[in-house]
């Protein structure tokens, strides 16, 4: 069995977990999340713990570990939430909020407008910082990757949109 799946997920106080066949719903102070679990995994809720185990063979053990990690992310999301920080590096690179949109000026001839999906909130503490937050870890990461994808950091000058904790490997320019 997967080492990850062996550890049960603890349900903190104030979190309600409902299991309906292969659909699990987690409700907490920050909202609720629903996910369909793979049919190769059996999920049991008992004694303020969620336990995942593979249904058949060793081939499905990886699915049990994945399901356990996804459920843990749901529990953490509805209690604490997730935050992803982006930094804009470059002359004239700016970000500002306009309702549910982020207006990005990234050196193109036109400004880019990125629409935020439901469940993701954004803040701009400064013109060169974007802070994304929400309950769904996958959705936060997806939105952050889309914004970074507009202008990924380039290795020569380091300009572009990067994650706050990202280290960009720099290259030396060609010499004559």
UniProtKB/Swiss-Prot annotation:
Q: Name one Pfam family in it.
A: Ribosomal_L6
Q: One of this protein's GO BP terms?
A: cytoplasmic translation
Name the source's superkingdom: Bacteria
Q: Which UniProt keywords apply?
A: Ribonucleoprotein, Ribosomal protein, RNA-binding, rRNA-binding
A single GO cellular-component term on record: cytosolic large ribosomal subunit
The annotated regions of Basic and acidic residues compositional bias extend over 151-170
A GO molecular-function annotation: rRNA binding
Is RNA-binding given among the entry's keywords? yes
Is the Transferase keyword given for this protein? no
User: Annotated region Disordered: where?
Assistant: 151-176
InterPro entries, alphabetized: Ribosomal_uL6-like (IPR000702), Ribosomal_uL6-like_a/b-dom_sf (IPR036789), Ribosomal_uL6_a/b-dom (IPR020040), Ribosomal_uL6_bac-type (IPR019906), Ribosomal_uL6_CS (IPR002358)
Subunit-level organization = Part of the 50S ribosomal subunit.
Q: Which HAMAP family match?
A: Ribosomal_uL6_B
Q: What does this protein do?
A: This protein binds to the 23S rRNA, and is important in its secondary structure. It is located near the subunit interface in the base of the L7/L12 stalk, and near the tRNA binding site of the peptidyltransferase center.
- Annotated family: Belongs to the universal ribosomal protein uL6 family.
UniProt-recorded name of the protein: Large ribosomal subunit protein uL6
What's the name of its gene? rplF
């Amino acid at each position: 069995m997967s080492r990850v799946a062996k550890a049960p997920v603890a349900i903190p106080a104030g979190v309600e977990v409902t299991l309906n066949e292969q659909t699990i719903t987690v409700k907490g102070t920050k909202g609720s999340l629903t996910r369909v679990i793979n049919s190769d995994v059996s999920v049991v809720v008992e004694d303020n713990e969620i336990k995942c185990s593979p249904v058949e063979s060793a081939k499905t053990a990886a699915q049990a570990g994945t399901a356990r990690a996804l459920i843990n992310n749901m529990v953490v999301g509805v209690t604490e939430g997730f935050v992803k920080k982006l930094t804009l590096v470059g002359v004239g690179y700016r970000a500002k909020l306009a309702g549910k949109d982020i207006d990005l000026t990234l050196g193109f001839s036109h400004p880019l407008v990125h629409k935020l999906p439901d469940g993701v909130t954004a803040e701009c503490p400064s013109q060169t910082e974007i802070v994304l937050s929400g309950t769904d870890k996958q959705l936060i990461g997806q939105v952050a990757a889309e914004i970074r994808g507009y202008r990924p950091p380039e290795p020569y000058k380091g300009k572009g949109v990067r994650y706050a904790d990202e280290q960009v490997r720099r290259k030396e320019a060609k010499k004559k």
